[in-house]
Amino acid sequence: MLSLSLGRAHGGFCDGISRRNMLRLGGTGAMAGLSLPMLLELEAKAASGRGAQAKSVIMIFLEGGPSHIDMWDLKPDAPKEIRGSFDPISTNVPGTQIGNILPKCATITDKFTILRSHSHRDNGHQTGRHWCLTGHKPSFGDGQANSTPFNELYPSIGSMVSRELGHTGDVPPYICVPEPMGPGGPGFFGAKYAPFVIETDPVQPDFQVRDLNLAAGTSRRRFDLRRRLLSGVEQLAEVRTGRGRAASMSTYYEKALELVTSPGARRAFDMNSENPKLRARYGLTSLGQCCLLSRRLVEAGCRFVGISHGSWDTHV
């Protein structure tokens, strides 16, 4: 049987070749143009175990969804009832066009990848967001604002990254700015993998993260005494109410305590220490400053930053 897939067995990716696939190709090497040295080279590459190099993710989630036929996939040859309202422009990648409302993106298209093969058939905002952020098609809810909270079931991509890659640096592994990112909760992973939500817009002149510093009049010694007292109360709660709920509350407290006691976290959130020229390059807007803050958080060790920006809602 002829098979020219060089990914991991059956439906894999291009980062390796399994021994089974190599043997399947071996019998048709001449037909496929693969010599024995080429096959050995492919197998050696697969054995090297070279994995993904990315350490962090910044996801800009455009709430409501601006239309793809206005931005990345204009379909200029489609009937006017289908194609977008804007004209296509050429980019610095030959053969690739995008919407004329993105002129700066057109000059750096070689620096990013446009995926035009992703879609789903759900036109409800709530259910569609759940599908995008969790990878699971909702099987309940009516897509309206009063639907059952979907993030109570499946974990979001941010929680998955947090769980699989773990904690590093002085900041939480999963952070949302400036508000929760749709159904971006931990689902059945539990509170340990919930996002830390900034709840403040970094474009504001007086931007600061709530409760990041010790309360006025509270010394470090007094803070440590309170922390030990809290630990004793938690142990009592575990005995009286069971481990599950107490553990969830403990996770929230620990996240807050880590931020309060971490100089690195305070530095990452200190937007006033940033070079004014760099802030201006990002744009003195909510989205621009959220992107700059996200960069600072990633540099401080955050695994996944979710930026929520919207609401977009195109109806014709």
What are these regions (language model features)?
Residues M1-V316:
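Ligand-binding pockets and gating/stacking loops
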